[in-house]
């Protein structure tokens, strides 16, 4: 996978993850072009399309488009399943995810994506183990943020 984008029906980019080094200028150009192409397509059209030297796989969930660019030899159906699995993980974590969850908790959305995909390849297919890793990270963060007494800070309590 080259990159993954999440954007709204209004063309607002909500999340982007790039797995291949690309300049900012080129990224912006690619995002703009791809959003125009995907948003112009009718709902009944195929979720796969040829774009530049890549294949694009996208799926709309509510008001968000989840869009992945893959190499020519990669499987479109597996990529569609990866998108669906990511949405399932977001749903499990947020409880019926919506665009506002992504906007206000974008760091969690990126963290979930990073637990699921690494370098554009699937890291873990098990929803349970990905969610368990996220829960553990949340617990660590809560421990770090919880107030401690001076004695606890010094390791004396």
Swiss-Prot record:
Q: Which residues carry this modification: Phosphoserine?
A: 146
Main localization, broad class: Golgi
* CDD domains, per the entry: AP1_sigma
* Highest rank taxon of the organism: Eukaryota
The protein's topology relative to the membrane is: Peripheral membrane protein
What are the GO BP annotations of this UniProt entry? Answer: intracellular protein transport; vesicle-mediated transport
As for subcellular location, the record says: Golgi apparatus; Cytoplasmic vesicle membrane; Membrane, Clathrin-coated pit
Q: What is one Pfam family matched by this protein?
A: Clat_adaptor_s
TM stretches of this protein: none
Query: Which UniProt keywords are present, listed alphabetically?
Result: Coated pit, Cytoplasmic vesicle, Golgi apparatus, Membrane, Phosphoprotein, Protein transport, Transport
Q: Which GO terms describe its molecular function?
A: clathrin adaptor activity
The record's GO CC annotations read: AP-1 adaptor complex; clathrin-coated pit; intracellular membrane-bounded organelle
Q: Does the keyword Transit peptide apply?
A: no
Q: How does it assemble?
A: Adaptor protein complex 1 (AP-1) is a heterotetramer composed of two large adaptins (gamma-type subunit AP1G1 and beta-type subunit AP1B1), a medium adaptin (mu-type subunit AP1M1 or AP1M2) and a small adaptin (sigma-type subunit AP1S1 or AP1S2 or AP1S3).
Q: Which family does it belong to?
A: Belongs to the adaptor complexes small subunit family.
Task of the protein: Subunit of clathrin-associated adaptor protein complex 1 that plays a role in protein sorting in the late-Golgi/trans-Golgi network (TGN) and/or endosomes. The AP complexes mediate both the recruitment of clathrin to membranes and the recognition of sorting signals within the cytosolic tails of transmembrane cargo molecules.
From the Swiss-Prot or TrEMBL record, give the protein name: AP-1 complex subunit sigma-1A
